[in-house]
């Protein structure tokens, strides 16, 4: 089996190639990855908004994976990468017309999100659905070595944080467990939701890290101190205000049994955080 990953140099894309186990791998990205090169993956340099290059790139692959993030395409907007970039991928698959599998990484509880991020993701999903043989993967927050969140949570935990809202549920899923679910769901045509069953708020994550670091925990902010506590957290410059507001949403899903079906003991984010906080010998 041959796969190509758009956004392959990012966390999700890199792990897809590392963990899927395809006979041939390629990644389409502006950035070359020495890690993927060492695995024998072919680098296709390009911008996801370059229609001609994208149309040419998808040819010859059994599975086409769309895992590009806005930060992977410097200077491009979230809308450009997710919507216009996806249109190019869909055009390429339709042009090849060989029943290629399109795998798109979206976000769980998308229908509840009111921000531009979620609106754009919904539009992108609409484009994905134009390909009959598609799989939309809607995970909660994904963690693992090299993820985009854990290091910054540790940085936050090292800061003095008096209070923060006890809201939301990250329901984090380890990338290895997510890939196990995906590999067992490739025959699915449609969308799958993947979240952990153990609830964990952003404040819980910070306090787990604080405890592992030997620091005093932050207290839950009340109604009157909620807004100021969020502002103070964003002023530390570790997470943007938009990111912090996203962390206060609920990414738990009652009807997602896929993780338990295919992974008997899902990896715990609390344990992962505690281990990440320990001094490395």
Each PLM stretch: what is its role?
Residues 184-240, 253-256, 260-281:
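Mid/C-terminal beta-alpha module of Rossmann-like enzyme folds, strongest
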Residues 112-116, 137-154:
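Flexible, glycine-rich beta-alpha linker
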Residues 70, 84-122, 130, 135:
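Conserved Rossmann-fold NAD(P)-dependent oxidoreductase catalytic core, especially the SDR/UDP-sugar
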Residues 153-173, 185, 193-195:
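A conserved pocket-lining segment of Rossmann-fold NAD(P)-dependent short-chain dehydrogenase/reductase
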């Amino acid at each position: 089996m041959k796969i190509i990953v758009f956004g392959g140099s990012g966390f999700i894309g890199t792990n897809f190639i590392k963990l899927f186990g395809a006979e041939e791998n390629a990644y389409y990205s502006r950035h070359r990855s020495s890690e993927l090169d060492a695995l024998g993956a072919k680098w296709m340099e390009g911008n996801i908004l370059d229609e001609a290059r994208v149309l040419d790139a998808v040819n010859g692959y059994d599975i086409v994976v769309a895992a590009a993030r806005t930060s992977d395409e410097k200077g491009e907007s979230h809308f450009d990468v997710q919507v216009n970039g996806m249109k190019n991928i869909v055009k390429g698959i339709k042009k090849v017309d060989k029943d290629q599998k399109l795998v798109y990484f979206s976000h769980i509880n998308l229908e509840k999100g009111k921000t531009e991020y979620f609106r754009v993701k919904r539009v992108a999903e609409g484009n994905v659905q134009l390909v009959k043989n598609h799989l939309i993967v809607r995970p909660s927050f994904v963690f693992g070595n090299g993820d985009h969140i854990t290091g910054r949570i540790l940085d936050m935990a090292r800061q003095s944080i008096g209070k923060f809202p006890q809201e939301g549920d990250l329901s984090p899923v380890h990338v290895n467990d997510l890939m196990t679910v995906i590999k067992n769901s490739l025959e699915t045509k449609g969308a799958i939701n993947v979240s952990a069953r153990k609830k964990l708020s952003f404040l819980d994550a910070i306090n787990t890290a604080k405890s592992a670091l030997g620091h005093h925990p932050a207290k839950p902010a009340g109604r009157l101190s909620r807004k100021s506590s969020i502002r103070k957290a964003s002023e530390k410059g570790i997470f943007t205000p938009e990111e912090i507001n996203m962390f206060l949403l609920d990414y738990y899903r009652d009807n997602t049994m896929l993780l338990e079906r295919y992974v008997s003991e899902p990896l715990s984010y609390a344990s992962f955080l505690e281990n990440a906080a320990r001094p490395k010998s």
